Each structure stands twice: as C-alpha cells, then as structure tokens.
C-alpha cells in the first residue's frame, strides 16, 4: 500500500510538471528523480513515457527517446519504482495544450479505466474481465493498443509478473493486479493504470 501511494504521488507530480518541449527521456529521468525522493530503492521494470506518436506504444523494448512534447499533445507516464522489494505501478495521462479531441479521449480513457476497475471481482477469470474491457472499447469506439493484447497483469514482490488479463487466461484472479488498458484512435493514445487487490474481503484499489 505504501509503495503504491508513493508511486501515485510521483506520477501526479509529473502530470503537473510536463511542458511543451520536454523530451520523453527528460521526463523519465525526472520520474526516477522523484521516485528516489519518495524513498524508492530502484525500479522493477524501466519507467516509460509516451509523447506524440510515442504514446502509441508502451513496452520495455521501446524506451523513452528524445521526442519532444508538442502543443497540443497527449502524454502518459508509466512509473514503476520499487521500495525495498515492494513494487509500485501507476500510469497517468495528461493533455498538454488545448485540444478538444485529446481531452475527449482522456476523459473516455478515465471512464473506461474506472469501469474496468469497478468490474473486478476476487476469483473472476482474467478472460472475463478482458471481455468487460472489450465491450467498453467497442462501445466507446477505441482500439486496444497493447502489443501483447492484454489490459493488465498480476504483480508480486520484486515485480514478479506471472499472468496477464487477456482472452486466453481463464485463471482466477487473486492478489494484486495492475489494470492498465492502453487505448487510442487515429494516432492518439491514452492510458491509465491502477493496482487492485483481490482478496477474501473484496476488491480494493491500492492508493
């Protein structure tokens, strides 16, 4: 809980600091700097930043570049610090400048994220939650951009990932899961991510 709380503080600070002209690489370095200031001991997977066309791909194989934030733009930050073995994982998106289309995508992405999180139930199969997400994407008219075709993964101590939320995974979901649908349309993308604990007492968003 404390690790995720600190992670959310880091990503929220980034959302308020981003400006046109800053590069993905600069923003990733700033994310690490903020994470250390919040007590992080490392990162369990590389921090990712997406700006402009770079926001269409979120994967460790595509690290932050010298691509600069435009005006207008839609930028996301996927922040992944570790605190003495406990991982944090959060993504937030923000519109830079004034653009109604990007603002609409941002609002829809947030609504979709909230709806998927609200649908989480302890022990539900991963592919059932994916089906919920797929219906939302179709209803809102967006594409799923994740390169592996999933909307999230489990997350254990040390950043261990053993399963994904995709059409093929019928394993019951228990423990900590990252819910992170990466969606877009017409060359613009947005992403939100939260950690949800699925236990005997129900589903709890870690914050």
Q: What is the predicted function of each stretch?
A:
Residues 1-207:
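Active-site neighborhoods and metal-handling regions in enzymes and metal-associated proteins
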């Amino acid at each position: 809980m404390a690790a995720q709380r600190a992670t959310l503080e880091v990503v929220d600070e980034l959302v308020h600091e981003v400006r046109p002209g800053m590069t993905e690489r600069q923003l990733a370095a700033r994310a690490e700097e903020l994470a250390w200031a919040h007590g992080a001991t490392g990162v369990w997977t590389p921090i990712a930043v997406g700006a402009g066309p770079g926001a269409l791909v979120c994967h460790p194989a595509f690290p932050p570049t010298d691509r600069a934030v435009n005006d207008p733009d839609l930028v996301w930050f996927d922040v992944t610090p570790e605190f003495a073995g406990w991982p944090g994982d959060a993504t937030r998106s923000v519109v830079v400048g004034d653009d109604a289309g990007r603002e609409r995508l941002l609002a829809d992405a947030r609504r979709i994220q909230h709806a998927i999180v609200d649908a989480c139930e302890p022990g539900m199969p991963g592919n059932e939650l994916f089906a919920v997400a797929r219906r939302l994407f179709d209803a809102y008219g967006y594409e799923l951009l994740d390169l592996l075709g999933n909307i999230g993964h489990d997350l254990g101590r040390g950043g261990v990932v053993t399963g994904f939320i995709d059409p093929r995974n019928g394993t019951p979901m228990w423990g900590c899961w990252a819910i992170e649908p990466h969606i877009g349309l017409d060359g613009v993308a947005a992403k939100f991510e939260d950690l949800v604990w699925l236990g005997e007492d129900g589903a709890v968003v870690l914050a």
